[in-house]
Amino acid sequence: MTTPAIELRDVYKEYKSVRTVDLKHLTVRKGEIYGFLGPNGAGKSTTMKMILSLVKPTSGSIYVMGKPISRRSYLSQIGSMIEEPSYYPNLTAYENLHVFQQMLGFNKEHIWPTLERVGLADLKNKNKLVRDYSLGMKQRLALAFALVKKPTILLLDEPTNGLDPAGIHEIRELILSLAHSEGLTVFISSHILSEIEHVADRVGIIHKGHLVYEGEVDAIKSNTWVEIGGRFICEKVVTQLRTIEVYPRDISTRRIVLDSLSDDNIAAVVKTLVNAQADIYAVERKTETLEDIFLNLTKEM
């Protein structure tokens, strides 16, 4: 069995006797992009901080590349972007990373290639002071800080927070490109469901500190069905559809729900219903979305 890049076992965190995180088991596989979703205050940032040893869990075990995080050497394998990074506003991107390099001791030769990878090494930007950066450029610089150590794992907490749609698209494409070209494992948190749906291989949803869902993004997208709106006599419709070996998932006097069908089979269903004197006003293919799952699991009762 392949060793996970990140594994949490029976991890919980209490603040003032309130359990804010309670994760029985969470694994991030090597080389995947794992989307960590949840409402504000669900425990996403606390979980990431525990993985980075910035917050100590009340109980439980955390492993990175199969080793317990009590061995601090594991941190050299992780690049992180947690909350808003601190910069020296009167320095350039290179100078900021050089200060970082002097603190941590990684190879100075990594700095320019890293800035090139995040799009901050061109003539227009190389001499620009960070105080003059747009928010999107600052997010790129934050990614550079995470990447410059040449990590194998990236932890990104809300990396598109505060960006406009164009900026979100830019950062999303950059993360995808870096993950695939470098073979990185990426653990990314967000409350923007559509962005996670675009980048992640697998998602976990945390709600009130508990992991309430985990699944493959492709499996979510493959859950499709057909809905037919109209006026139906249920018993008559069921009998008629049985003659063409179609069995509804659900049926009412106003709606029929069927498993996913080919175009030809949908045409046959419609023809059969019309012959049964049903009035039809809508036929629609439906696909389950991450938003459907998220809202269903996190809605307040």
Tell where the protein language model's regions lie, with residue ranges.
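Conserved ABC ATPase "signature" region
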Residues: H98, Q102, E109-N125
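Conserved catalytic motifs of ABC-family nucleotide-binding domains
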Residues: K150
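Short, charged/small-residue-rich alpha-helical element at the C-terminal edge
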Residues: V226-D292, L297
